[in-house]
From Swiss-Prot:
CDD domains: WD40 (cd00200). One of its GO terms (cellular component) is preribosome, large subunit precursor. WD repeats lie at residues 445-486, 488-526, 570-612, 615-653, 656-695, 699-738, 754-784. Disulfide bonds: none annotated. This is Ribosome biogenesis protein BOP1 homolog.
Amino acid sequence: MTKKLALKRKGKESEPINKVVASSEASENEEEEEDLLQAVKDPGEDSTDDEGIDQEYHSDSSEELQFESDEEGNYLGRKQSSSAEEDEESSDEDDDGEEESSDEEEVEDEEKDSKLKQSDDKPSSSGAASKKAPTTELSKRDTSKPEYQDSDTSDEEDIRNTVGNIPMHWYDEYKHIGYDWDAKKIIKPPQGDQIDEFLRKIEDPDFWRTVKDPLTGQDVRLTDEDIALIKRIVSGRIPNKDHEEYEPWIEWFTSEVEKMPIKNVPDHKRSFLPSVSEKKRVSRMVHALKMGWMKTTEEVEREKQAKRGPKFYMLWETDTSREHMRRIHDPVSAPKRDLPGHAESYNPPPEYLFDAKETKEWLKLKDEPHKRKLHFMPQKFKSLREVPAYSRYLRERFLRCLDLYLCPRAKRVKLNIDAEYLIPKLPSPRDLQPFPTVESMVYRGHTDLVRSVSVEPKGEYLVSGSDDKTVKIWEIATGRCIRTIETDEVVRCVAWCPNPKLSIIAVATGNRLLLVNPKVGDKVLVKKTDDLLAEAPSQDVIESERIKTAVQWSNAEADEQEKGVRVVITHFKPIRQVTWHGRGDYLATVMPEGANRSALIHQLSKRRSQIPFSKSKGLIQFVLFHPVKPCFFVATQHNIRIYDLVKQELVKKLLTNSKWISGMSIHPKGDNLLVSTYDKKMLWFDLDLSTKPYQTMRLHRNAVRSVAFHLRYPLFASGSDDQAVIVSHGMVYNDLLQNPLIVPLKKLQTHEKRDEFGVLDVNWHPVQPWVFSTGADSTIRLYT
C-alpha cells in the first residue's frame, strides 16, 4: 500500500538519484566527510556549499511534485504528473504498448528503491540527506510512559571527569586531567608529536571521524548518527531528522471572529441591586459610632500612646531589677567541692607520699600557700582508728561559707580554642638546612674551664683561652694542638683579629692585654705582622693623666717574645672582655671594676688609647662595634646604650627588662641585635623597630652565657649552663615591612656539667655552617 505526499518545491528539477554512479557517489561522500571534519575541528570556517543549497531549495520556478512511499515512509519513486500520463496514454496505440510501459516503470521503481537503500547504508552528504521525504504521519507519544523517559538530560549524562564546567587548560601543568567518581586521578593519555599525528592521519581510516574529548583527553570516534547530525547542523537544517518542518497545519482555534457570544445567559437581578447584608452591617457600624461603642483609628492610636507612656528614662539609675529577676528565675548553683583523691586517703600509695625534697619545697611555700600543689601534706596510718581529728576542718568550712556568701556568681561562656591555633606556623627545619646537627670533633688539652674561643678569618685555625693559664692554638681540620702559650694569670677572653691581612690574637689575662703573633699560616703574613708590631710609632699627641693612669703600652720582654707576644697593654683593673673592630685597627676592652673608665678603645696603628665615657651609667658588662656604622654598643647590667662615635652622642637606649646581661652579638647587616641574659632568656632587638625586644626566647633551663651570629648563613647559636647549645634560624629580610623569621632548629647537648657550669662560649666558623662551643668540662666541641 502506498501513500501520496504533495510538496511544493522552488527551483528547477534536479537530476534523478538513480542516474548517479555508485563509485562517483562514494568518492563525493568521502570528500564531503573530510570537509565536514575540517569544519568540526575549525568552527571558525564555514565549509557548506551555498550553491548546492540554493539550487536544492531556492529556484525560480515551483511545481507540485508527487512521490510514492510505503507504510514505513521509505520512498518508492516519483509519480508522474497528470499531464505526463496523458501524453503517455496518447502516445500508446494498443494495449500491448501500455503493458510494456507499465513493466518498465516497475523495473525503474525497483532499481531506484535498491539504490536508495544502498545510499542509506553509507554516510550520505548534505544534499542526499535533504532529498529524503518526511513521513506523513505524526508521531504520537505514549501517555502511559513519563514524558522524559526516553530523553537524556544534562544531569543524567555519564560524566567520567567530575571537575565540572571549568577551563581544562588549568590542568596543562599536571599529569592528570581530573578525577573520576571514586576520587581517583584521571591520567592523561600519551600525547604524540606532529609526526605521530601525521602517521595516524595516513594509517588510521577513521582519523577523519575522530575528535578529542576535552574532559578525558581521549580520542572519540564519531558514529554514523553523529556524522549525520553534524552534517545537518553545518548545513543549517534542523538537527532532528524525524522532525516534520512542513507538517499540515491544525487550526485548534479559529482565526475568524465570531459574531455570536459563546454563552447568552442574562445577568442575575442581584448583580445590579445593592447588597442587603452590607446594608445591615453599615447600619450597625453607624449605630455603634453614635453610641460611642466604636472608636476611630486616630482614637485607638492615642490610647496606645497613652498606655506606652513617655519614651525617656532615668539615665543614671542603677538597673538592679534585671539581676534580681535573674537570680530568681535562673539561679547559678554553688560550685561543688572536688572529690577526695588518693592523696587524701588514710593509707595512700607510696608514690603519693612526700619525700624529703618535696617536703622541703612544700614548707618553703608557707608564705605563698596558693602556689602549693596540695593544701595539705599526705600522711599514712595503719588503720582508720589511728587517724586524728583534722585541725583545719573548721577553718576550711568557714572559708567555704565566705566563698558562697561573698563571691559573686556569673555564667561565662568557655572559649574552646585549640592550642595548635595559638602556635605560630613555622617552616620545617628540613627546609632550612644547612645547619649543624651532630658533634664532629672534640678538642682536648686544657685542664680547667675553657672560657673563650675564637676562629681565624680564613677558618683554618682556632684559639682558646682557659683558667689553666694557657692559650692554645688548634688546627680545625685535624684537631691537633699546634702551639700552647702560657700566661701568668687566668685567660678571660681571646679574640682573633678579623682583618685577614694581619695575624694577631688579643688575649685578656688578668689586667694585661697581650697582642700575640700565633706564627701559623702564611709566613709572609706572619713577617708582615711582626714588622707592624716591632717599632712603636712617634707620639704627636700628649696623653692626659687620666689615660696614663688607666692604661700603659709596652713591648713584650724577651721570654714573652719567644712565645709570640709582641705588645703588652697594661690596664689598672682586671680585663673581662676584648672585642675587635671590623677593620682590625681598633679593639675595645671591658673592666667591670673600672667605674667611669670601665670601657677603653685602643688604636693598634698609633698605639693610642681612649676613654669614651666620663661618667659611669652602670656596671659595663659587654661592648661591641657596629659592623657598618661608627656606632658603639655598651651593655650594662639592665640596659644597652648605642653611641655615635663621630657625633659623640647617645643614639638609642634599649630596654631589656632583665636582671643581668651576659653577652651580645650583632647581625652582620647591623640592624638586629641578640642579647643573652643570666635569667634564662635571649632577646632579639630590631634596631629599626623599637627600643623593646622584638622577641623574647626562653629556650634554655639555666643561665644563657653566650650568643653568636653567623657571618654568612641566617643562623645563630646560644650556650647555657644546662650544657646545651641551641642552633636557631634567624632570617633578616631586606624588605623593612617583613619581620625577621626566627625558628629553633637543633639542640646539641654533649658537654658535661662541672660546678654548676655548662657551656661558657660559642662561636661560628667564618665560612662553613659549623659552631664551636667551650665548656666547664675543659673541652672544645665542634658541631657540623
